[in-house]
Amino acid sequence: MNKPTPAIVSQDAARRLPRWALLLFCLAYAVPGLVGRAPWKSADLASFGYMLEMARGQTSWMDPRLLGLRPEADGLLPYWLGAAAIRLGDGWLAPAMAARLPFFVLLGLAMAATWYAVYLLARKPQAQPVAFAFGGEARPSDYARAIADGGLLALIACLGLAQLAHEITTSVAQLAFTALAFYGAAGIGRRRWWPEIGLLLGLAGLALSGAPTISAFLGAGAAVLHVLATARPWRKGDWRVLGIIALATLLAILLSSSMDLWRWRILLPQDAGSKDWRTILRLLVWFTWPAWPLVMWSLWRWRLQVWSRTPSLHVALPLWFMLVTLVAALTTKPADRALLLALPAMATVAAFALPTLTRSVAALIDWFTLLFFTGCGAIIWIIWIAMQTGYPRQGASNVQRQAPDFVASFSLPVFLVALVATLVWGWLVHWRVGRHRAAIWKSMVLPAGGAALCWLLLMSLWMPLLDYVRSYSVVVRNVMAIAHPAQCIQQWGLSREQVAAFAYHGGYRISQATPDQLECPWLVVNPEALAGLQVQASAGQWQLLATLRRPSDKGDDVMLLRRTSP
């Protein structure tokens, strides 16, 4: 028996967002940040370093190393994808751009899988809106498309998605495969086999991307929920569903075991202080904004469908995916990369809040979003004008303080792109304040549009500045001005990303210095490891030529030393 539904939706409110507009919207969000920039500190650059070494044949594809160091993130599949793209693009595409192409596809896969997952869940009988006495309620397919549009917009609106989803790390692969597994679990049992294939690839890909435990828990929980959500769980068709989910989960577990992917990374509660918990709480608030208030609202309005003997899958399934990834974020580090995996499920739960919102709540969302993103966009423009003209003086001085040697440049195409994006935002605001728009996804238009606008402005107007302060190109150029890349050079205590930066930006083949092998005339040293070097080698053998500092980061110095005696 279906529980009373809180959704009251007319056919007029179930209008769908035009496909071309939704596609352009996704492209406007996904493309900026993937093109026109150097690899950034730290995980983005470190991952690229391993991919570059693999593509050049400098390390094994089954056990990649960077000067003897294994990757911090487990899972080989993302590195394989990036390295294969670099090798295929050799000669006609820059390595950094080639490595980003598979991750651009993965981001698009995450968006598409989220849309289809929401659509399939919204088609379920328990998710349908109230039937009107004299007709006029939304048709099931139109209602599901409108909810799916809202879910995708809610995903894009999440503030934490922007930077991490545009990197070339295992986190992006985990996000895509989590969304793919979510789609498979949402649609399994239909006549077509696409959801089953999606579930199998999603759980296996998630395990191969370094999250085998999450993969196992998601698969097991999906199987249990499908049993609990069925009034007669032991029919032939339900046995088939349970068997497919169990098989996909078992294959992911066996794959993880065969490749030795299981790692214990859990931080027990006594390992984290009160300050860490406060930090995590702040991360949850801003990272998942604006989805989390809608999630709370949705869980309250749909509580009868969740807390019952036969829970409704359209809320219970995304809730399980959300809880598993939230627990992973609370018990592992870095928390933000684990929290990224919760966003597709949170966006789904938030989407089911849209048909239950009152006018006052919808208006509050619109006005807060309008003020917040308009203010953010204005600040980005003001700082850019200050970089170009020196006025306002306060903005120019702030930039000069953070990047003392940065010289701004003007690009007409970049300016026009940013200007068009700002004008589109103005049109979007004008459209939204119109009283004639009744679509249920309308409350997500401004949050998603504002997030896309600010990200696009940052990745266009501020790109030269961000490249200057977030990449190691400046440090490498300063070293190249003293030590030519063709000369023998060793390193002592550098991080993975620093080694990768010297290999990519300078073409250096830096070797690892050891106490009994300090034969090169040049030595690049991490200042924190200098004391250890002085213990192993005579201080009089080396002359400090320069201490090179990465802009905006005083704790990321590099020291260049030259041998003075054999």
What are the residue ranges of the model-derived segments?
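Loop-to-helix entry region of an early transmembrane alpha helix in multi-pass inner-membrane enzymes
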Residues: 76, 80, 89-117, 141-149, ...
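Membrane-embedded architecture of ER/inner-membrane glycosylation machinery
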Residues: 3-23, 171, 187-566
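Aromatic-rich transmembrane-lumenal/periplasmic boundary elements in polytopic membrane proteins
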Residues: 27-61, 262-271
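Hydrophobic/aromatic residues in alpha-helical transmembrane segments
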Residues: 114-117, 161, 181, 295, ...
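Intrinsically disordered, low-complexity acidic Ser/Thr-rich regulatory segments
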Residues: 135-154, 462
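Short acidic/glycine- and proline-prone juxtamembrane loop motifs at membrane-interface regions
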Residues: 160-173, 212-214
